[in-house]
Regions:
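M16 family metallopeptidases and their MPP-like homologs
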Residues: 5-11, 42-91, 96-147, 164-170
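Bilobed periplasmic-binding protein-like "clamshell/Venus-flytrap" ligand-binding domains
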Residues: 153-169
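Conserved catalytic core of Hanks-type protein kinase domains
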Residues: 27, 127, 131, 159
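His/Glu-based metal-binding/catalytic segments typifying zinc-dependent metallopeptidases
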Residues: 1-35
Length: 170
């Protein structure tokens, strides 16, 4: 089995583009079987055992990565397909339908996550530490709903630029 990670730097906690990155990552591969990476590499081609992406804001920086596990003979094709999805997000603005689908998916994930008391307490504690305010998930989602397809594409071009992406194979 081969493990592959692609990633780059992204925004710190509180950055104005943090929520845009959060939504963009969710579309790409964050936490859902309807993400682009999952649908392509797992469902369509059956190349990976698992695949996801995450965007992690830290106090002074942040990082974003894709992780996948596959058979060694599939790693090159998997890398090619990952880069294809990144390029598509850089080059093509989401349609209104795609945007609404992404927002509905994220809203459902946030609502389900809020039902977990431990997750909720940890998220609220982090918010209090960094912002001295712990908004309900609905307040955060209302801000996410203001994100435009153009803003998503701008962040994709900034964060997913090929020259900024590092690759780790092990």
């Amino acid at each position: 089995q081969t493990h592959v990670m692609l990633g780059s730097h992204t925004y710190p906690i509180g950055h104005p583009k943090q929520l845009t990155m959060f939504l963009l990552n969710n579309i790409l591969g964050g936490g859902s079987m309807s993400s682009r990476l999952y649908l392509s590499l797992r469902e369509k081609y059956g190349l990976v055992y698992n695949i996801d992406s995450q965007a992690v804001p830290l106090s002074d920086t942040g990082y974003w990565n894709i992780y996948l596990a596959c058979e060694p003979q599939h790693k090159d094709q998997c890398l090619e397909l990952c880069h294809k999805e990144l390029k598509q997000l850089r080059d093509t603005r989401l349609t209104a339908t795609q945007m609404q689908r992404a927002l509905r998916q994220l809203e459902g994930q946030m609502a389900i996550s809020a039902e977990n008391q431990e997750n909720n307490a940890l998220a609220m504690a982090k918010q209090m530490l960094y912002h001295h305010h712990a908004p309900a998930w609905q307040e955060t989602f209302a801000k996410v709903q203001q994100i435009t397809p153009t803003q998503l594409q701008d962040v994709a071009n900034e964060v997913f630029a090929p020259e900024k992406i590092y690759t780790l194979l092990y």
